[in-house]
């Protein structure tokens, strides 16, 4: 379950970065 949460956080961070770049 921890792994899933970690991956979800990474995706969120990636999304935020992509939004910031755009």
Swiss-Prot record:
Distribution of this protein across tissues and organs: Expressed by the venom gland.
Secretion signal, residue range per the UniProt entry: none
Span list, region Disordered: 1-22
Q: Which UniProt keywords apply?
A: Disulfide bond, Secreted, Toxin
Entry's localization field: Secreted
Basic and acidic residues bias locations: 1-15
Principal location listed in the UniProt entry:
secreted
Post-translational modification remark: Contains 8 disulfide bonds.
- One term of GO molecular function: toxin activity
Q: Which domain of life is it from?
A: Eukaryota
GO CC terms of this entry: extracellular region
For this chain, the family text in UniProt reads: Belongs to the CRISP family.
Instruction: Kindly provide the name given to this protein in its UniProt entry.
Output: Cysteine-rich venom protein notescatin
> What lineage does UniProt assign to this protein's organism?
Eukaryota, Metazoa, Chordata, Craniata, Vertebrata
């Amino acid at each position: 379950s921890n792994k899933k949460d970690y991956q979800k956080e990474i995706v969120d961070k990636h999304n935020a970065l992509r939004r910031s770049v755009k």
